[in-house]
A protein has these predicted regions:
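Cellulosome-associated attachment modules in secreted, modular CAZymes
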Residues: 1-162
Length: 162
C-alpha cells in the first residue's frame, strides 16, 4: 500500500517531542521554521490551559523554533519541584559524578553525556554561574501558561498524543 500522508514526530534526548500536523509523506518537514505548523493540543486536554502555539519554544532565536529542553526524567513534562521533577535528576547527576569525590552540589567539573545537561554543552552544573538548574528554572517560570510564575507549575507538557 502506498502512504500519501502521515504525521512526523521528533524527539531528542532531554527535550519534549514535537509532531507535525498531517503532512504529505514525501514532504520535507523543517521543525525549526515558523512555516511548519506543529500539532498542539489547544484546549483538548481540558485542564484549563490553551496550548495553542506552544508545542515548541519560539524564544531561542528570532525566526526559528526549538524543542523545549529539560525533560530529564523522560515523562513527557518539564517540572522543577517534587514529585517527579526534573531538577532532582540534575542534582543526582552532579552528586553521583565519578569525579565528584566529596559529593558537592557546586561541583564544577562534571563533563560527559548526562540527562541533566540542559543546554547540551557536555557539562552538568547545579550552582551558579552558568548552571543548568537556573536555565531550567527560568524556562519554567517564564513558560507562557505559567501566569503566576510558580516553581511547582505542573502543566508544561509534551504535545504528542500517547
Amino acid at each position: 500500500t502506498q502512504i500519501d500522508s502521515c504525521f512526523i514526530a521528533l524527539h531528542h534526548r532531554t527535550h519534549l517531542g514535537v509532531m507535525s500536523k498531517k503532512t504529505n509523506a514525501t514532504a520535507l518537514v523543517d521543525f525549526t521554521s515558523y512555516l511548519t505548523q506543529p500539532f498542539d493540543f489547544g484546549t483538548t486536554i481540558n485542564n484549563g490551559y490553551d496550548y495553542t502555539g506552544l508545542a515548541q519554544n519560539g524564544n531561542i532565536k528570532p525566526g526559528y523554533r526549538a524543542l523545549w529542553s529539560g525533560d530529564f526524567v523522560k515523562n513527557g513534562k518539564i517540572k522543577f519541584t517534587n514529585p517527579s521533577d526534573d531538577l532532582n535528576s540534575l542534582f543526582f547527576d552532579i552528586l553521583s559524578h565519578p569525579d565528584n569525590l566529596s559529593g558537592n552540589s557546586n561541583y564544577n567539573f562534571a563533563y560527559g553525556y548526562y540527562q541533566g545537561d540542559y543546554n547540551l554543552d557536555g557539562k552538568i552544573k547545579f550552582d551558579n554561574p552558568a548552571d543548568d538548574k537556573n536555565m531550567l528554572y527560568a524556562q519554567i517560570i517564564f513558560y507562557p501558561l505559567n501566569f503566576e510564575y510558580l516553581t511547582n507549575f505542573d502543566f508544561f507538557l509534551e504535545q504528542i498524543p500517547k
